[in-house]
Amino acid sequence: MNKRQQAQLGDAFAADGLCLDLARQLADTFDQARLQQIQGVLDSPVAQRFSEAERAVGEDGGAALASYRAQLAQRPPREERLALVQRLDGAAHTSELASLLRYEVGKTQALLALMARGDSLDEQALSRQTASQATALRASSVEAVESFMLYAYRQMPSAQLAAYAALYEQPAVALLLERCVQVLPQLFAERRALLRKAAKR
């Protein structure tokens, strides 16, 4: 891939542009009042407390989280606590979005590897070639997300964890996240189409 193609790749997959296109797609589903309702939920004191706990995990470079994960096999969490984390993960679509993004990035990398050899695949063929990765990515994402949540929220009472999950179970928030899951593959596919088009020039 030459420098011009590298620049096109950077432009196509820039986070700001991806987020903007996602927002445009979602704008057809949500009116301003509903968006304000969702924003209010995600900016609530409960949500802010959990966001702060998540950010704190990275303050030591993730060393404590890595140590915690190493101990999980010998010291598994209480079943009811794990169930709450799984409820939150399901409501927030965290594992689903994480595995989806990893899969779409992997598909793009596979396409770039083909293009570097002068080959290419259309979107359907690329999906068939990479489909076997999806299950493994899903399993590893679930494991990573659950262990992260168990560690990040370890000092949060279960009642607060349940309240946090309930925020994501509100209909407007749930619909927003479901639409994100639906739209993201389309946005990545559109960007891969641009890469194919650029490679033919």
Over which residues does each language-model region extend?
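Extracytoplasmic/secreted proteins, especially bacterial periplasmic and envelope-associated proteins
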Residues: 4, 17, 21, 25, ...
